[in-house]
Amino acid sequence: MWSSIISFLFFSVALCQPLLFQKRSSNVSDFISFNASLPNVTIFAMGGTIAGYASSSTETVDYAAGSVGIATLVDAVPAIKNFSNIRGVQVTNVGSEELTPANVLNLTQLILAEVAKPDVHGIVVTHGTDSLEETAIFLDMTVNTTKPIVVVGAMRPSTAISADGPMNLLNAVVVAASNRSIGRGTMILLNDRIGSAFYTTKTNGNMLDTFKSYEAGFLGMILDQRPHFFYSPATPTGKVHFDVSNTTELPAVEILYGYQGLNPNLAKAAVDLGAKGLVLAGMGAASWTDPGNEVIDGLISNQSIPVVYSHRTMDGFSDYYYNGIPAYFQNPQKARYMLMLSINAGYSIQNITDIFSLEY
C-alpha cells in the first residue's frame, strides 16, 4: 500500500515540475523517428513563447521568447512519436512581434514545397501568439492544399510549471496527422480548441484561453488526443487563394488607428512613406472622422490608394466605408494581409471590395 501511495505522490509531483531541456541541434533534417504505419508531419518552428526560456520555473512574464530549438521542443513531448513521424525545420526563432511579411512569405514558400511531397500528411507551425493570427490567415489564403496546416503557440514559456506548450504541440501534431482534419484550411490550436485561421483571434494578452472565434465559432476541440470536429470539412465562404510561389516582396500596407481628434494627415504621411494601401482601425463599426474621410477620399480619387475600413473593436461587422472598402468581418491585422495579397495580385478596387465582402 505504501509503495502505491509513494508512487502516486511521485507522479503527482512530477506533473507539477517544469520540463527540463537538454539542448541539441535546433534543426532536424530527417524524421526523428520513423514508423511506416504512422503519417508524416513536418513542424516549422518560428519561435515565440512556446520556445521561451526563463531562469525560474515560476516566471511567466519576464522570459526570453524564441530560445529553445524545435528538436528540444519535440524531445520534451515523447508521446508525439506515437501519433506521427516528425521532421522539424527551424525557420527562425524570435518573438512573433519581430516577424515581418518577408518572414511569413518565406515560411509560406517552404510549406508550399513541403505539402507538394506526396508522403507528407500535414504541417504544424510553432509560433509566438502575439502575431500568430496574422501568419495563420496568410497561410490560409496562400497555401492551396487540402492537407492540414495547424498553427500552434503557448502562453507560458517552456520552462514554466504547467507550461501549456507541450500539450498544445502534441495536440497540434495529432490534428495535423488526422484524416478528419483534411480539407479544413489552416487551423489555430491552443487550449484544446481548434479554430479557423480566418476567424480566430487573440483576445487577451495573458490568459491561456486567449484565442477565440466569437461569431463564427470553433471548428472543434481535442479530447484525449482525438480531434472532435463539429462540422464536415469546409472553408470560409468566399475565401480567395493567392499564388505567392514566385513572389519575392509584398507591397507595404499600413494600419492607422481611429480615435477622437485623430490627425488626418497621418494617412498622407503613410502613403508618402511608401504605403500602397491603408487599413483603418476605425471606431465602433469602422467610423472615421469627417476630416479623416476627406483625406482618405483624396488618396482614393487622386492616387488610387485602396483603403479598407475595419474596426478597432474586438469583433463585429464593418460596412461603413465612405468611399473605401469595408472590411466586413475581418479585423485590421487580418485585413492588412488580405489587402497586401490583393494588391500584389493586381486586383482592382472593385475586385478587392468583392474579396472582403466574401462574394468573390
UniProtKB/Swiss-Prot annotation:
This is Probable L-asparaginase 3. Residues 1-16 form the signal peptide. GO terms for molecular function: asparaginase activity. It is found in: Secreted, Cell wall. It holds the Pfam family Asparaginase. The lineage of its organism: Eukaryota, Fungi, Dikarya, Ascomycota, Taphrinomycotina. The keyword Hydrolase applies. It comes from Schizosaccharomyces pombe (strain 972 / ATCC 24843) (Fission yeast). Belongs to the asparaginase 1 family. Substrate binds at residues 96, 129-130. One of its GO terms (biological process) is asparagine catabolic process. InterPro entries: AsnASE_II (IPR004550), Asp/glu_Ase-like_sf (IPR036152), Asparaginase/glutaminase-like (IPR006034), Asparaginase_C (IPR040919), L-asparaginase_C (IPR027473), L-asparaginase_N (IPR027474), L-asparaginase_N_sf (IPR037152). Keywords: Cell wall, Glycoprotein, Hydrolase, Secreted, Signal. It catalyses: L-asparagine + H2O = L-aspartate + NH4(+). It is an enzyme of class 3 (hydrolase). Glycans are attached at residues 27, 35, 40, 82, 106, 144, 179, 246, 302, 351. Its EC number is 3.5.1.1. Residues 39-359 form the Asparaginase/glutaminase domain. GO terms for cellular component: cell surface; extracellular region; periplasmic space. The active site is at 49 (o-isoaspartyl threonine intermediate).
